[in-house]
Amino acid sequence: MSRKNRAPKRDVLPDPLYNSQLVTRLINRVMLDGKRGTAASIVYGAFEQIKEATGNDALEVFETAMENIMPVLEVRARRVGGSNYQVPVEVRPERRTTLGLRWLVTIARLRGEHTMQDRLAKEILDAANNTGAAVKKREDTHRMAEANRAFAHFRW
């Protein structure tokens, strides 16, 4: 175990265009090799595509998509008496957001569209409509937690 104190959480500044911390966190998640400008243009371009496709505010569509992706339950391994049990636990709010963003970007990168901007826009639209691989990932996580409900009394 580390002897040092836990590092304090840093505040994320809201992005200049949408004034949202969630969008800033998405940009940080998309960013590779410290290229924030490139990541920002990808995210803002995807938001423009979403606005054109739906006619609604892109931020609202994104927030709906995030609500559909973020897990409520997950399983954690717990060793009891020589065997490992998958124990279902509730996901803390901060971790919910982190997992949602991570799944969204990871799955968008795996999509087949030509540019990352297209992939991200399509995945956000799919998630907002409760379809797509990111929502499936959440459902699988919930299904796993439900299947292991019998071990919920091992919660710590």
Swiss-Prot record:
* Gene Ontology biological-process entries: ribosomal small subunit assembly; translation
Q: Which Pfam families match?
A: Ribosomal_S7
Cite the InterPro entries for this sequence.
Ribosomal_uS7, Ribosomal_uS7_bac/org-type, Ribosomal_uS7_CS, Ribosomal_uS7_dom, Ribosomal_uS7_dom_sf
Recorded GO molecular functions are:
mRNA binding; rRNA binding; structural constituent of ribosome; tRNA binding
A single GO cellular-component term on record: cytosolic small ribosomal subunit
- Name the source's superkingdom: Bacteria
Per the record's keyword annotation, is DNA-binding included, yes or no? no
Keyword set, alphabetical order: Ribonucleoprotein, Ribosomal protein, RNA-binding, rRNA-binding, tRNA-binding
> Which PANTHER family does the record cross-reference, listed alphabetically?
RIBOSOMAL PROTEIN S7
Physiological role:
One of the primary rRNA binding proteins, it binds directly to 16S rRNA where it nucleates assembly of the head domain of the 30S subunit. Is located at the subunit interface close to the decoding center, probably blocks exit of the E-site tRNA.
Family membership: Belongs to the universal ribosomal protein uS7 family.
Q: What is the protein's quaternary organization?
A: Part of the 30S ribosomal subunit. Contacts proteins S9 and S11.
Would you tell me the protein name for this molecule?
Small ribosomal subunit protein uS7
- Tell me which species this is from: Streptococcus pneumoniae (strain ATCC BAA-255 / R6)
Gene name of the record: rpsG
